[in-house]
Amino acid sequence: MQGNMYLNISQVIKAFSIVALGSISASAIFMIVVLFFKTVSACEAFFGILSAASGFVIGAYIPISQFSNEVQTVCNLFPASQITIMLRNILLNGLLDHINTSLQGVDQGMFVLSLKEYFTFQAKLFKGYLDMNKMLEYILGVILFCIVAQIMIYSGSYKKN
C-alpha cells in the first residue's frame, strides 16, 4: 500500500465523537418533530422529503459557501451543517497541511485557504464565523434545549389520569 496517513488516532476518535454527537443532535431534534405526526405514513413521507432537502442544508450536494450570506446563516442554524463542517475540519486538515507544506510557500498558502473557503471550513452565522469550539457549544446547546422541550411537551401531552 502506498501513500501517507494524515490522520492520527486522536483525530479518528474526534471524528467518531463528532458522528455520535451528530446522531444525538438529530435524534433530539426529530423526537420533537415526530410528536406532531398522527400516522406513520405521514411521518415517513415527511422524512423522505426532508432527507432529500437535508443534503443541500448540510452542504453535501453544494458547498454552503456558494449560497448567499442569508442562506448560509439559515443552513448553519441546523446542527447537522455544523457537524458536517466539524467533520470536514477533522478529516481534511492534516491533508491540507501536507499540501501547504508541499507547495513550500510558492502561493503563500492561498491554495489551501481558497479550498477552505470554498468547501466551508467555518460556519457563517449572522455575518460572523463560528470556530470549532463555538460550533460544539452551539450543538450542545441545541441538544439541551431539545431535551428540555421534549420533557415539557411529553409531560403536557401524556399526563396521568
State the predicted function of each range:
Residues Q2-Y6, M31, L35-T39, P63-S68, ...:
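Transmembrane helix-loop junctions in multipass membrane proteins, especially transporters and channels
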Residues M1-S54:
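Alpha-helical transmembrane segments and their short interhelical loops
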Residues S102-N161:
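Junction motif at the cytosolic side of a transmembrane helix
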Residues G22, L77-A80, G141-C146:
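Hydrophobic alpha-helical membrane-embedded or membrane-associated segments
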Residues S27, F56, A60, I147-S155:
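Membrane-embedded alpha-helical segments of multi-pass transporters/permeases
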Residues F16-A20, V71-V74, L140:
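Hydrophobic alpha-helical transmembrane segments of multi-pass membrane proteins
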Residues M86-L87, L92-F111:
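Membrane-interface interhelical loops and short interface/amphipathic helices
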Residues F37-L95:
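Transmembrane helix segments
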